[in-house]
Amino acid sequence: MNKEEQRKNSAAQSIRWHFPSIHPEGRKFFVIAVIISAIITYFSWLWMAWPLGVLCFCVAAFFRDPIRTVPEGDGLIVSPADGMVCLIADVPPPPELAGADGLGDAPLTRVSIFMSVFDVHINRAPVPGRIARIAYIPGAFVNADLDKASEKNERQHFMIETKEGINVGLTQIAGLIARRIVPLTKVEDYVERGERIGLIRFGSRLDVYLPAGVTPQVALGQRCLAGETILGQIGSQAKPLTGMRL
């Protein structure tokens, strides 16, 4: 690669860092909004064009797909979602992920991350490995911030098996506004840590089931970035974190 190509690549990367691309799942919504805005503007209905212009911006912002710097290290478990840690509790794994060949039946630490409509809604793999299970469960649409959302709402379970044979579970949960869970992977796919695996449209929550013995390295109320924030480390003897909102 010559210097001119390097310069162009560097400029393109800089633009992507400052102006994230729109995920393919959101491009059709963006195009529809732009076309409607253009038609209304053409017919001089300017009083409607402004709100639709704002709508175009909101659609682009919601489906933004920023680049993330994924940390490297043995056993690291990263956040699969942008948002705020709303719950940390020891609970039995869901039936769809339980069993001897799954997450087992004993309680595991579940870290729940609430995604508002302002957060990036691309979900990423917390660990590298094989997608061993995917299970979609239709359900209700109660507030995703509530504990019962894990059992009542529309949801999709994933189980990723690492090369060491350790299983990590995660669940996409639809919220009050979100009515569409979109998978980007399938069973038997191999994913890297931080790789895009799905998205939920318009506000939702994501639960991560940490393997036995893994201590969460986030605190209630902490903000997380998908693919970057470390939730825990397999094999680590770290102490639980506590935090204070100031």
Swiss-Prot record:
The active site is at 204 (schiff-base intermediate with substrate). InterPro entries: PS_Dcarbxylase (IPR003817), PSD-A (IPR033175). Its EC number is 4.1.1.65. It is an enzyme of class 4 (lyase). Is synthesized initially as an inactive proenzyme. Formation of the active enzyme involves a self-maturation process in which the active site pyruvoyl group is generated from an internal serine residue via an autocatalytic post-translational modification. Two non-identical subunits are generated from the proenzyme in this reaction, and the pyruvate is formed at the N-terminus of the alpha chain, which is derived from the carboxyl end of the proenzyme. It comes from the Bacteria. One of its GO terms (molecular function) is phosphatidylserine decarboxylase activity. Pathway: Phospholipid metabolism; phosphatidylethanolamine biosynthesis; phosphatidylethanolamine from CDP-diacylglycerol: step 2/2. It is a peripheral membrane protein. Its main location: membrane. The keyword Lipid biosynthesis applies. The record marks 203-204 as: Cleavage (non-hydrolytic). It catalyses: a 1,2-diacyl-sn-glycero-3-phospho-L-serine + H(+) = a 1,2-diacyl-sn-glycero-3-phosphoethanolamine + CO2. It is found in: Cell membrane. One of its GO terms (cellular component) is plasma membrane. Its cofactor is pyruvate. Catalyzes the formation of phosphatidylethanolamine (PtdEtn) from phosphatidylserine (PtdSer). Belongs to the phosphatidylserine decarboxylase family. PSD-A subfamily. Heterodimer of a large membrane-associated beta subunit and a small pyruvoyl-containing alpha subunit. PANTHER family: ARCHAETIDYLSERINE DECARBOXYLASE PROENZYME-RELATED (PTHR35809:SF1). This is Phosphatidylserine decarboxylase proenzyme.
